[in-house]
Amino acid sequence: PVKKVAGKGAGAGLLKDIPKMLDITRAVVKAVHTPVTVKTRLGWDDNNRIITDIAEPLQDCGIAELAIHGRTRSQMYRGEADWSLIREVKNNPRIHIPIIGNGDVTTPEQAKKCFDEFGVDAIMVGRATFGCPWIFEDMQHYLTTGELLPPRSMQWCVDILKEHVERSIEWIGDERKGIVHSRRHFAASPAFKCLRDF
C-alpha cells in the first residue's frame, strides 16, 4: 500500500483500475508455468470495499489462490483488520480456490480464530514476524495441540537472532548491509530491546 508503489498505479493502486488488474492477472497466468497467487486488500478506501466483487473475476483469470488483507489501501496498517469480508469471499459458493486471510494475525490464538471463525484455507503472517521469527512454530504448535508453548528464555531468543544476522550477512554478501538489514526487523523483539550493543 506504500505511496511510491500505489501512486504509480501498481500494487494496491490497481484497486482503482480493476480492468487493468484483471488484464495483468490474466497475462501473468498465461505467461508463466507456475501457480499464480494474487494478494490484495478489501478495496481502495471505506467507500470502495470491492473485494467481494473482484474475487470471482480474479478466480476466472486462472489464479491458484487469493490472499486478502483485511484493510483498505487508505487504512495502510492503521485500525483493525476487518475479516468479515474475507469470510464473505470464502463463503461464496462460486469461489473454489483457496482463500488466504491476512491482517492482525499476531498470536497463536488469533491464528486459530482466523480458521475457526472465518473459515480461511490458510493465513498469512506479516509484521508479527519482525523480531519474532519463532511465531510460526508457536502458531503451528497451538493449531496442532491447542496448547501454548512455554515462553522461551532470553538466551534462546538472542541465539536465534544471532543466527538470523549471520544468515542475513551470508545471503546479502556484505557484513554491514546484512547487519543493517537484520536490525530493522529486530526492533520489535523483546530480546533486541535488552541488547544495547547488538
Question: What positions do the PLM features span?
Answer:
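Active-site mouth loops of central-metabolism enzymes
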Residues: 13-16, 38-51
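Glycine-rich tight-turn/loop motif centered on a GG-T
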Residues: 3-21, 74-83, 144-148
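Active-site-proximal loop/short-helix segments
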Residues: 1-9, 69, 133, 138
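N-terminal small/glycine-rich loop or linker at the start of catalytic domains
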Residues: 1-8, 29-37, 42
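Alpha/beta catalytic cores of nucleotide-metabolism and tRNA/nucleoside-modifying enzymes
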Residues: 23-26, 31-33, 45-65, 77, ...
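Catalytic beta/alpha-barrel core
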Residues: 14-17, 67-69, 101-103
